[in-house]
Structures are given as structure tokens and as C-alpha cells.
Amino acid sequence: MPKTFFITTAIDYTNSPPHIGHAYEKVLADVIARYRRLKGDKVFFLTGVDQHGQKVQQSAAKAGVPPAEFVKEITQKFVDLWEKLDVKYDEWAETTSERHKKVVQGILQRLFDAGQIYKDKQTGYYSVRQEQFLTDKERGPDGQFGPEWGQVEFREEENYYFKLSQHKEWLLQYLDNRKDAVIPDFRQTELRNAVEKLGGDLCISRPKSRLDWGIELPFDKDFVNYVWFDALTNYISFAGYDPSQSTLSSQPSTFRDKWPALQIIGKDILVPAHGIYWLIMLHAIGFPDDQMPQLLVHGWWNLGGAKMSKSAGNIVDPFVIVDKYGAEPVRLYLTGAIATGEDADFSEERLLRYYNTWLANGLGNLVSRTLSMVHRYLGGRLSRIQSKQSTKLASSWLNSIEQGVLTGETFSYSEDFDETPYDKVFSLPKFQVHKAVGLIIETIAKCDRAIEESAPWQLAKDPTNAEELARILYNLTEVIRVIAIWISPVMPKTAHGIFDQLNWKMELSEKEERFSLADAEWGRLPDGHVVGKPKPLFPRIETDKGV
């Protein structure tokens, strides 16, 4: 039985409402999850919120409300945004849940009993942002701590520590042996360089006298767990992990069926959180090398070349953007206008151009124009006419359409979907979602050029061209159907809207609302199929109204 495709995102910290960067990560994960469902895979998509920690306690105090009440309100904002953006997760993680607390405490007790956790006093410089003590290894060439550490202050405190440094050589060897542990590969190089500099152990507690909003240590009631063993553990606690079982083979089948996961994170939490702390934590509790998660690291959406931040006042509110342009155009822009793993500048002007160029004038116009011609010249009924020229199928109709010749052969492709360009760009190991979006956009543009070159309106003037006209309009309608399936992971409601206008229901899907890549096989629109009437999919937005 095939394993479940398990995909996670970072859980979002509930000290402030979501911004466009949160939206990008979740939409990216949702698109990949939908693509795997499209291929017929069973998928488990986990996301959620991190509700504990010093910043939450401070923000709640500033707001004059208890932490539990504060995080409940912020949590709801994230839930509302994912609903608004049509992000369909299978499990929701909240770190205040009892289920999660039991797993965290179980893991901590196991590590404490194994001598992996010890108590010690520490004096030194402390990063308020990263909530950790720093060493000289974190200093830059100028001897100062870099801006990534935020406010740094001198502290003395007794706490519990995890023997992180003991596992340094293991992590280096693991990264050397597995070349795709981190995607893209330059991030793996970045991680390995950071591991080389790894020195001390990891503080995993805070005294309750300073922080009481957290999970109590099972072996010392005067301390709460520090953020890492709380936040990072969600990836397994909400997937069914049992901390009482010391080996992976003895875990419940519900967990073994899912693990390992593809974990989508931002570049700012690769080092040290996920690339060092998380991988070493898993190794310490018995996860073998071949069961380590794969880390897909995305870049940032900047604004005017600068990182978005509340303090700089340059945050893009995703609620406002979605209300203005719609969820599906925003999903298309967020996944199409940034290369996976790289940074990009968020621009509302560019989003508007995306909408008008590729949706209003592109896909929407292609559907409307084609179906209007089918009704005008064929009475709304398609005729599937085989080409007289050749019966040999092209391996990729995308390469042939460049010529602007719309024949049955041009729009056919290999029966092996692993050989189609669409499937390649979505599949392991790169997850190049932006290239899949680009392929769809390119196909729409080629269809428009092909219509102009074949000029169905001219063919319709001569009855002797009836077969050629019918063949062209069938192929155009069929490629629109294929595009709808291709675009469904990014724009599911748009895909359904196109199917409604085509008057077509998916044949191979288990449920009507579930798309199947097998349905993209060429020629599924039968001879004599009657299409629906065209309706505007994306009304054009005038520039002065959009921005």
C-alpha cells in the first residue's frame, strides 16, 4: 500500500496577525498538496499555530488580556485567512492542546532519562528575538551580533540544556550522505556551513519566575519548556507519534504511514531551528537517517527590496489584497511570480498586471472566445475529427503548438504522464511550482497565437473548410479542458468554473470535486459533446480602480 504524502508548513507564531509571507508559504504547500492529490496520492497536510512563548506572554500583557485569550483571537485570524485563500489542510496544530502537551513532555522525559538533558547555569549574551543565549561563534567579522539576532542583552540564568553538540558529527555526515536533505541545494550548503560552526548545547527551558506561558517540564515543575521542543514537535505530535515507543518501527501505523514529511519553511528558520535543532532532536529520539524529513526552503516576499516587518511599517495585509483581487488571482501570483527558494518583491502593480494579462485577457478570454466560436460556427456541438495527415502521437503537444497548427496530433502527448512537462516541474526533487504556472501561462499564450494564425472566422466562410474548422475548435476546447486540470492545484474554483462552461464532468475521479491528472489525457471530450454558454471568468480591472 502506497505511503501517504505528508506535507507540513511552519506553524505561525500568534503574537501578531498574519502577513503576506504567511499566506505565500501556506498557499505553496496547498498547491503541492493538491498536485499530489491530482496524481492520485493520499495526502496529509498539516499546518497550525505556535501559541506559547515569551513574545506571546508579553503581547498579551500589553493588550491587557490573559495569554490564552490573546492567542485565541490571533489564531482565529490565521484560520480565517486560510479559509479565505482556500487552503485545505487535513490537520490543524495548536500547541496549547493536551494532545501536543503529552507528546512534548513524553519526549523531554525520555531525553532526560537518557542523560541528553542536564541542568546548568549560564551567563552571557541573550537574543530576545531568537530566545536563546549566543556564543562568540554567532558574532560577525566585526565582533558584533548580526541583525538576525535582534535585541541582544546580557543575562545570567539557571536552565536545562539539551546535548546538541554531541550530535554535530552525525549531522555533518547525514548532510554529506543525503544531497537532497534541503531544497534548493544552495540552502543545504548554507546549513552545512552553519553546522561546522556549531559549538555549545541548546537551552530548552525557562524558569516560571520569568515565563509561565508554556508546557511544564515533566521533571521540574519550576520550569517550562523552551520554544524548540514545543513548536518543532508539532510535526510529529499531530501526526500520531507516540513518545512511549522508542523505535520508529514500534510507532502506531497511522504515524508510520505518513512519516517522513516534506517540510516547507522560510529561509529565516532553516538555521538553526529546523536544519540543526529539529534534525538533531529527531536523531536523539531514535529516528534513522532514512526517516529524516526533507526541508523545502522558500524565500521572502520583500517590499521595495526590503524585508517586510511590523516595525518598518511595510507589511502587506493579505486580507485586503484578497478582498480586492480575489483568492485565486492572489494564489496564482504568489506561486507564479516567485521562484521556489528565491526572494521576490511584492508589487500590487505587478499583481494587477498578472490579473489583467494572464487571467482577464488570457485564460478568461481564451475560454470565452473559444466557446463563443463553438456556438457560432458549430451550434455548440463538438465534432471529433481525426487528422488525415498522421496517426503518430507527439510526445509533447506543447512543443508542437509553437507552429500554430491545431491538429489532433499537435494536442496529443505521451501516455506516460511522468514525461509531460507539467508533471516534471511539479515532481521531486525541485518543486518548481512557478515553472508549472509559467507552463500554463505559456500554453494560454500559444493558444491565442494559434487562433490568430488559423483564423476560424475565415474558415467558416467556406463550407469546404467545415472539417478543418471543426477539428480546430475541438482541439481548442480540449486544450482548455486540459489547462483547467493543470491549473486546478493553483486555482481550483477557476477549474470548476471552466468545467461548468464546458459542460464536462471528470470521468476518472473518485468524487466530482476531486481532480485527477489522468483526466488530462487527450481526447476525453466525446464526439457530439455539447458545450455550455461562455460566462466571464475574470472581468478586467481598470488600472485606476485596482491600485
Task: Show the residue positions of the predicted features.
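Extended, non-catalytic structural segments that build the interaction scaffolds
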Residues: 159, 345-359, 400-408, 413, ...
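A glycine-rich phosphate-binding loop feature that marks nucleotide/adenosyl-phosphate handling sites
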Residues: 125-130, 297-300, 349-350, 384-391, ...
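Amphipathic alpha-helical segments within well-ordered protein domains
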Residues: 319, 423, 484-485
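Helix-loop segments that flank and shape redox-cofactor active sites
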Residues: 255-264, 426-431, 456-459
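Structured secondary-structure scaffolds
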Residues: 2-40, 44-47, 99-103, 147-376, ...
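Basic, alpha-helical terminal appendages of large translation-related enzymes
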Residues: 1-4, 18, 44, 48, ...
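Conserved, charged catalytic cores of large soluble enzymes
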Residues: 1-14, 31-204, 241, 245-254, ...
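Active-site rim elements
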Residues: 94, 264-268, 469-470
